[in-house]
């Protein structure tokens, strides 16, 4: 468990990851759940801005969000097709 939990914002495509991260000690939130609680997080801009204002790391599959974070020095973990491909390759090694 991290000493100073990082604040993490999980984009809606990976709703549920926030719960898994919280279970191991991270301070994680889901865009989908925050929206259900009444926060106005309906656009990419508002999601990125929320992460920035709350000093959170954004976890997303949205390439444009990843690029926007990179351009504006906002911490982001982009789960794009290239990252997923690397995971698949790693798992395929188990079958060789």
Regions found by a protein language model. Name each.
Residues 2-3, 9-24, 29-33, 37-39, ...:
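Acidic, PIN/NYN-like endoribonuclease modules and their adjacent C-terminal/linker elements
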Residues 8-12, 57-60:
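Short, hydrophobic beta-strand segments that form beta-sheet elements in well-ordered domains
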Residues 51-70:
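Acidic, metal-binding active-site segment of PIN/NYN-like and related structure-specific nucleases
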């Amino acid at each position: 468990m991290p000493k100073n939990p990082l604040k993490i914002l999980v984009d809606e495509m990976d709703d549920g990851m926030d719960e898994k991260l919280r279970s191991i000690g991270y301070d994680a939130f889901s865009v989908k759940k925050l929206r259900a609680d009444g926060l106005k997080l309906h656009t990419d801009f508002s999601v990125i801005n929320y992460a920035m204002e709350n000093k959170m790391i954004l976890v997303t599959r949205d390439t444009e969000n990843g690029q926007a974070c990179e351009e504006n020095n906002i911490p982001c973990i982009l789960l794009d097709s290239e990252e997923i491909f690397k995971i698949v390759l790693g798992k395929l090694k188990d079958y060789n």
